[in-house]
Amino acid sequence: MNITVKDLLDAGVHFGHQLRRWNPKSKPYVFDNRHGISIIDLEKTYDLLENASKAIEEIISQGKQVLLVGTKRQAEEPIRELAAATNMPFCVNRWMGGTLTNFETVSTSLAKYKSFLRMEEDGSLDKMHGKEVAAIKRQMSRMQRNFEGLLNLQGIPGALFVIDSHNEAIAVAEANRLKIPVIALVDSNSDPSVLSHPIPGNDDS
């Protein structure tokens, strides 16, 4: 792993949330409080990051995908960049309830969106009547927000990688229900006990 504790320090990963937002379950990863801010223990962050990296490598070596999830504004760019670098599916818009627990229905809708995209590419959409085209375009616009990052999703993922497990509580709950491992950046306002591989750190840095 080509990251050092100093790298984490320089990135501000040690800055947690204000004490009034502190989740007591994050206590094992907080070593101090300064000026009303929780300070995260970067030695523990480093060790858990290393463990999480190994877990991801193992999942990928089995031919499984890792679904990258980060729907808050600060998470969108890093999630998109990570998805582009790894060719993994991602979600940066609103998490659709049932993405995992109602995967069959979601897969059907995703297949429909893919068929619309093919029609647009091969020109068959242009051969349809105006009202039909307008209706399909409206559907595509709605679907684009939900499915743009899932076009290469091959099935139920082998794991979730999440930025801000507190914000993505629904996605985490669905994964836990299906016993899908969750690797997540967890700030001092979050509950690390619901995660397979918590990585304590500033989820806004």
Regions found by a protein language model. Give the residues of each.
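Short Gly/Thr/Asp-enriched flexible loops that form oxyanion-binding sites at enzyme active sites
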Residues: 77-84, 170-178
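Short glycine/threonine-rich loop/turn motifs
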Residues: 171-173, 178-205
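Conserved nucleotide-binding/hydrolysis micro-motifs of P-loop NTPases
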Residues: 72-75, 95-100, 165-168, 188-192, ...
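N-terminal cationic and glycine-rich segments that engage phosphates or anionic surfaces
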Residues: 1-65, 71-120, 130-135, 153
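Short glycine-/polar-rich loops that comprise or flank the Walker A/P-loop
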Residues: 63-64, 87-88, 155-158, 178-181, ...
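Internal active-site segments that recognize and position negatively charged phosphoryl groups
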Residues: 158-173
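Short hydrophobic alpha-helical runs that function as membrane-insertion/retention elements
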Residues: 66-67, 89-92, 161, 181-186
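Active-site rim loops that border cofactor/substrate pockets in soluble metabolic enzymes
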Residues: 117-159
